[in-house]
């Protein structure tokens, strides 16, 4: 992918939420789409359609693992439950963020492919700034890459030999 002012052009981003967080997911979907990202919605699609956060988190994480999308944005009430589900998919790193600094760090230091947040925790404008910070940040190498390798080794130690995902 080409780099364009610290972001990847043609990046494909998957979005997922439970039924309680559709509003914020939709706002973030349109926000990043307006910036030129290719956006894919994995649901929930209606507040009347009950979708549990583990289902949404898993869908987006598995799509990254398969290579169907590059990164993900997940939203539930707090961001915690949906990120826990995504993190169960081997090779996936999802970080919960409720501020811009953390959003930058989970990308630079932890090489997270997914950012998660809570509709009950962050407002719309802050959420936009959070995703902007995440997608404008770049993964750092050196000691940070070594630490991510240590996390991958934990997965391997527990039988996930195919855990590495870049």
Question: What are the roles of these predicted feature ranges?
Answer:
Residues 30, 58, 62, 84, ...:
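Alpha-helical segments flanking ligand/cofactor-binding loops in enzyme cores
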Residues 38-49:
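A short beta-strand-loop structural module common to alpha/beta enzyme folds
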